[in-house]
């Protein structure tokens, strides 16, 4: 897209592909962001987000005034607001802009991006987001992007479990699961989960496009936010329990399509 890019990660090999395509490797967060016009982060867990933004030599301390900060990790809406407030105090506009679409969307530049923060800052960041995503929406004040991602993950939880249950039922009823998937994919039951993860469930292909352990983190955040609002989410709660049971069996590094394992007869 023509933008000069500097990258930093804890493990240099994680950035190797980006460096091979022209990005410049930096040895610290401070070195990476010191001259940046826009800083983009995508890490694993809320504690990782806190570390890269708030620690000594971190982003808020090291980024130049005016640089746009965009955290694209799925994390707590409360943390997104904290980053926004701390960054604003140093003259750094900040957006929470989590994504959906998995590894396929990332590689193809077709991610869904949902952003919270000040709308004029979102407009300034939009050309960069357009290099990564296809469905890019401004959702409102700081934290709104993360709240939208919570809604996204709630919907995915039910959809993924629904596909696994449908295929498990088809098998138990003596149907050809592949033929069943083909038939129901042409009707109103169709979903991204059905089209993309349904075939993987049939093949028992559990290579991660999105890790179970990270989905557990997302669902836990969503349930926490719901509980803060005295909102019951029974489907999310049940699916979270299924995934936690899989993680307890050592399967946290498998892809979310491995939920079909929860329906295997022992």
Predicted regions mapped to residue ranges:
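A short, aliphatic-rich alpha-helical micro-motif
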Residues: 30-34, 60-63, 129
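Residues in the short beta-alpha loop(s) of Rossmann-like NAD(P)-binding domains
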Residues: 10-11, 45, 118
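Glycine/threonine-rich flexible loop motifs
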Residues: 43-56
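Active-site-proximal catalytic alpha-helix in oxidoreductases
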Residues: 109-116, 137, 141-173, 182-196, ...
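Rossmann-fold dinucleotide-binding core
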Residues: 75-157
């Amino acid at each position: 897209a023509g933008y000069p890019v500097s990258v930093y990660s804890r493990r240099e090999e994680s950035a190797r592909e980006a460096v091979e395509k022209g990005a410049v490797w930096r040895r610290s967060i401070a070195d990476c962001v010191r001259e940046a016009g826009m800083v983009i982060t995508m890490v694993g867990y809320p504690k990782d987000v806190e570390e890269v933004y708030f620690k000594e030599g971190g982003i808020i301390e090291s980024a130049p005034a005016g640089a746009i900060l965009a955290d694209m990790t799925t994390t707590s809406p409360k943390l997104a607001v904290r980053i926004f407030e701390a960054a604003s105090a140093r003259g750094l506009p900040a957006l929470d802009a989590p994504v959906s679409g998995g590894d396929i969307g990332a590689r193809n530049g077709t991610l869904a991006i949902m952003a919270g923060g000040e709308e004029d800052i979102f407009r300034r960041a939009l050309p960069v987001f357009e290099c990564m995503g296809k469905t890019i929406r401004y959702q409102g004040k700081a934290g709104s992007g993360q709240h939208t991602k919570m809604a996204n993950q709630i919907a995915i939880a039910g959809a993924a479990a629904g596909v696994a249950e449908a295929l498990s039922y088809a098998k138990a009823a003596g149907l050809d699961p592949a033929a069943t998937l083909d038939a129901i994919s042409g009707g109103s039951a169709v979903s991204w989960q059905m089209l993309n993860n349904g075939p993987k469930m049939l093949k028992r292909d559990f290579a991660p496009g999105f890790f179970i352990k990270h989905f557990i983190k997302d669902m836990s955040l969503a349930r926490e936010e719901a509980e803060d609002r005295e909102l019951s989410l029974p489907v999310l709660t049940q699916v979270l329990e299924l995934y936690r049971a899989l993680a307890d069996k050592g399967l946290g590094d498998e892809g979310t399509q491995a939920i079909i394992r929860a329906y295997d007869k022992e």
